[in-house]
Amino acid sequence: MIYIDNRQNKIKVNEELENKIKEIIDYALKEEKVNIDYEISVVFIDNNSIKEINKDYRNIDKATDVLSFPMLDYEDGEVFKDIYLNYEFDESDLDEGNLVLGDIALSLEKAEEQSKEFGHSFLRETCYLTIHSVLHLLGYDHMEEDEKVIMRQREEEILKSFNLHR
């Protein structure tokens, strides 16, 4: 189950965008071997809202593009398919039968700014940020160079499957 909640009014959100976000999340999770019913919440916000969240959770007082709040625990360098592929989740891990993977806060205002800066479509930038965040929910990171290379490769592979190039 993918929940999308638009809490901003600076960028128009249409059904096409919401459907593409859901489609790309579902595809990424299948590619990453998430073989259980799941729940992810995506909240579209503006720069002011994401700045507040970034300050509250990361002590960084500036707007960013996307923030991820994973619900599962991962050891350094391990991802969902390494740990949870055949894991037996019990009822306390589930919400109405769905594994809660986490929440995504995405600034559509920042996505629009970055799409212009990088010279590609708003849809491509929003999908990229969504995939980036979903991979964080699955344990991927980019703090170390070797992890960054792996994460960027997965992002690009998923984007190419949707014909979304830079």
Curated annotation (Swiss-Prot):
Its EC number is 3.1.-.-. Its main location: cytoplasm. This is Endoribonuclease YbeY. Its cofactor is Zn(2+). Single strand-specific metallo-endoribonuclease involved in late-stage 70S ribosome quality control and in maturation of the 3' terminus of the 16S rRNA. It is found in: Cytoplasm. Belongs to the endoribonuclease YbeY family.
